[in-house]
Amino acid sequence: MNTGKVIGKGFPKDMTETTLSGYYASGGSGDKKLIYRTDIINSVPEYPVFDNEKYLALAYKYKLIDQKYKLAVLNEVVCDVEYQEDGNSHIMYKQYMKCPKSFAFWRKICMQYPDSNKRLLVDCVHYVADSIIAKNKHYIKESPRKMLTVLATPPGLLLSLFFRIKMDSLMEVK
């Protein structure tokens, strides 16, 4: 349904530039249309490919670009979006189970460039859960935050169990 309105919070009136991470870390919400120059998109590494996995967080490149560049902001609708019932937000649990290596990779990137201490902890717990689902026994050694990863292992194990239970319940509905 097209409302012609900006989704989520608009940018503050006095804001002329920000990083995507900075916007969300300061309380921003909703989908935002990101428009980058091709040379900037091409300046960061390509999306990695993991065997038998078809998902990687699109924000991977945005997180890397945030380290070098800021975005100009515009409080206008530049693209109408129609959300699908079976769209990405409705199938995330399935994605967690089908693409754990991709999600673990994304969480490692987030742990390297944390937006806040709270977000770092959340990403670390998710990294552990994704690594457990992927059956990666070397996840602590591969972590950019080894000590925090050790501490995040118990809640990460619980989160991986939650994902499995949630996935099973979604399968029963069909």
PLM regions and their residue ranges:
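Membrane-interface aromatic/basic loop that binds lipid-linked glycans or pyrophosphate carriers
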Residues: 131-174
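Charge-rich, low-complexity amphipathic helices
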Residues: 63-64, 86-88, 94, 129-132, ...
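Short, solvent-exposed coil/turn segments at beta-strand boundaries
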Residues: 118-119, 150
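Alpha-helical structural motif
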Residues: 37, 58-61, 99, 103, ...
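Conserved nucleotide-sugar donor-binding catalytic segment
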Residues: 3-90
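Catalytic core of nucleotide-sugar-dependent glycosyltransferases
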Residues: 79-84, 91-117
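Alpha-helical repeat scaffolds in large eukaryotic proteins
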Residues: 108-111, 129, 133
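Structural register within alpha-helical repeat arrays
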Residues: 120-130
